[in-house]
């Protein structure tokens, strides 16, 4: 007599390296340029803002919530230099090489709970298993930001994304 045994994979934990803190400098008086090497008005940023999959299974990553502090107001259209637009900020986090479009509101973050994707696919980004030969187990990210009026030199604010990472 035979007996078939069926195994079910039950992944109960994952290991991921996520950036806890990073800084950037933004110049409201600069010239707005958004391209692979132009980050709006952000002049300097962390060189390694990266998520790394340390698990043996593939994962997905997205941003599911964004919080702000320091009086900043996240918007999805380019702020003017008028006082009515004081401390308005267009802000995006994208996979390196993916550029947000100025005219595409969905490319820019808003505060609160909303799914936000690191590339243009409209879906969570796939991270290959640890040790992927092509580096697909890591995603390098770049920050894009545009702000104009309402700031003093040395002022600070925070944008805090919540990364949701799941088994693929």
What residue spans do the PLM features occupy?
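Proline-rich low-complexity regions
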Residues: 1, 17-21
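C-terminal, structured domain-capping segment
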Residues: 1-10, 43, 49-56, 114-168
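Surface-exposed interaction patch
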Residues: 3-10, 23-114
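Proline/serine/threonine-rich low-complexity linkers at boundaries of modular beta-sandwich domains
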Residues: 8-18
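Solvent-exposed, flexible loop/coil residues
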Residues: 20, 24, 28-30, 122, ...
């Amino acid at each position: 007599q035979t007996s078939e045994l069926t195994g079910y994979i039950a992944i109960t934990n994952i290991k991921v390296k996520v950036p806890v803190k990073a800084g950037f400098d933004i110049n409201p008086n600069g010239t707005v340029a958004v391209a692979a090497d132009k980050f709006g008005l952000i002049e300097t940023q962390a060189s390694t803002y990266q998520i790394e999959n340390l698990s043996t299974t593939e994962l997905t990553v997205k941003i599911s919530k964004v919080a702000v502090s320091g009086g900043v107001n996240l918007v999805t259209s380019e702020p003017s230099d008028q006082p009515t637009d004081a401390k308005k900020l267009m802000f995006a986090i994208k996979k390196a090489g993916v550029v947000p479009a100025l005219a595409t509101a969905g490319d820019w973050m808003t505060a609160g709970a909303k799914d936000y994707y690191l590339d243009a696919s409209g879906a969570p980004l796939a991270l290959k298993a640890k040790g992927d030969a092509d580096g697909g187990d890591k995603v390098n990210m770049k920050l894009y930001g545009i702000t104009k009026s309402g700031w003093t030199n040395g002022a600070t604010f925070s944008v805090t994304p919540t990364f949701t990472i799941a088994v693929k």
